[in-house]
């Protein structure tokens, strides 16, 4: 189980990303449309003034049951370890153990 402070930090980043998403997207569109370099620098300054944790690249996918940041499966939202345990206990419908 991940430390609770790390999980809370990640939730805070998600909230910030959602809050500033439209501002960031519109500023990036403006930069591509504006021809003059000085105006591009002004718009870029606006982007830099946004909180660092509001950038989507700062987000990290975590397992929703344990909070583990590594080996996550997007389809399930689980880490590999938790996914394996749940498949063995038949808690995930449609998932089967591989055998060859």
From Swiss-Prot:
Instruction: Tell me its family.
Output: Belongs to the universal ribosomal protein uS14 family.
The record ties this protein, via InterPro entries, to: Ribosomal_uS14, Ribosomal_uS14_bac/plastid, Ribosomal_uS14_CS
- One MF annotation (Gene Ontology) recorded for this entry: rRNA binding
Annotated gene: rps14
**What HAMAP family does the record point to?**
Ribosomal_uS14_1
Q: Name one Pfam family in it.
A: Ribosomal_S14
Q: Where in the cell is it found?
A: Plastid, Chloroplast
Organism classification: Eukaryota, Viridiplantae, Streptophyta, Embryophyta, Tracheophyta
SUPFAM superfamilies, A to Z: Glucocorticoid receptor-like (DNA-binding domain)
Q: Does the record bear Plastid in its keywords?
A: yes
Recite the UniProt keywords alphabetically: Chloroplast, Plastid, Ribonucleoprotein, Ribosomal protein, RNA-binding, rRNA-binding
Sum up the protein's function in the record's words: Binds 16S rRNA, required for the assembly of 30S particles.
How is this protein named in the record? Small ribosomal subunit protein uS14c
